[in-house]
Amino acid sequence: SDNPLILHVPNSESIKPLVTEVSTTAQALMDSFWPGPLTITLPKSDLVPDRATGGLPRVALRCPNHDGCRLLLQRAGIPIAAPSANISGRPSPTTAQDVYNDMNGRISYILDAGPCTIGVESTVVEVHDDKVIILRPGGITKAQLETVVSTVEYDTALVNAETKPKAPGMKYTHYAPDAPMTVV
């Protein structure tokens, strides 16, 4: 598949075997926004399979802001590739009931650890030296990123549908509810 996944980790220390380098800028972002809704893409090590990155040379990493999730990741002892629990192209669920409504009959179990505190995806960024490129807007804003890094830009692929996705959430439409709409 050419659609990269996010590898979830329990803390910033656990990314070391997964990447070939962590710049001071990337470390500053992790120190400021992890755990939380920030996904950082970094050059991947040989331990990360191409199917997890959509064949890209970078891996998307996130440390979720949920104690139960981080405990699960710690006990698993490996990163977990975890897309949103929804049908691709549909809005991301914020409660177990949302997951049930969207995925009913498609999955065997739902782990209900309470509702999400943020109803949007994580912000996905690519770090180059002291510059941050937003690949997918989400729970961390450009202004918040600029409190840590002086140069923050939006990726041009956000407005060009022909570009190969560089990060999770760029290939398919997000926030696409199945509802009628009237334009007045």
Regions from the language model: what does each represent?
Residues S1-V184:
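Active-site-adjacent structural elements in enzyme catalytic cores
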